[in-house]
Amino acid sequence: MPARKPAGARPEKPCPICGKPAVAASRPFCSERCRDVDLNRWLSGSYVIPVSKTDGEDAE
């Protein structure tokens, strides 16, 4: 009999770096290597979060 997932379980998502199935130890990645690649992208500035000015901020 196949193992059943709980009713509220989220569907498994692939590794965001290489697309392979994720493993629990490195989730959401498939390996330590993909975790390190993602961390390097954040630290090197490849990934950025856009910021928009709001009315309360002073213009410089």
UniProtKB/Swiss-Prot annotation:
Any one Gene Ontology BP term: regulation of DNA-templated transcription
Co-factor remark: Binds 1 zinc ion.
InterPro entries reported in the protein's UniProt record: DNA_gyrase_inhibitor_YacG, Znf_NHR/GATA
GO molecular function: DNA topoisomerase type II (double strand cut, ATP-hydrolyzing) inhibitor activity; zinc ion binding
Source domain of life: Bacteria
Stretches that traverse the bilayer: none
Positions bound to Zn(2+): 15, 18, 30, 34
Keyword Metal-binding attributed: yes
Cofactor(s) this protein requires: Zn(2+)
UniProt key word Zinc: yes
Keywords from the UniProt entry: Metal-binding, Zinc
Stored Pfam families: YacG
HAMAP family tied to this protein: DNA_gyrase_inhibitor_YacG
Complex and partners: Interacts with GyrB.
Function: Inhibits all the catalytic activities of DNA gyrase by preventing its interaction with DNA. Acts by binding directly to the C-terminal domain of GyrB, which probably disrupts DNA binding by the gyrase.
Family: Belongs to the DNA gyrase inhibitor YacG family.
Protein name stated in the entry: DNA gyrase inhibitor YacG
Organism for this UniProt entry: Nitrobacter hamburgensis (strain DSM 10229 / NCIMB 13809 / X14)
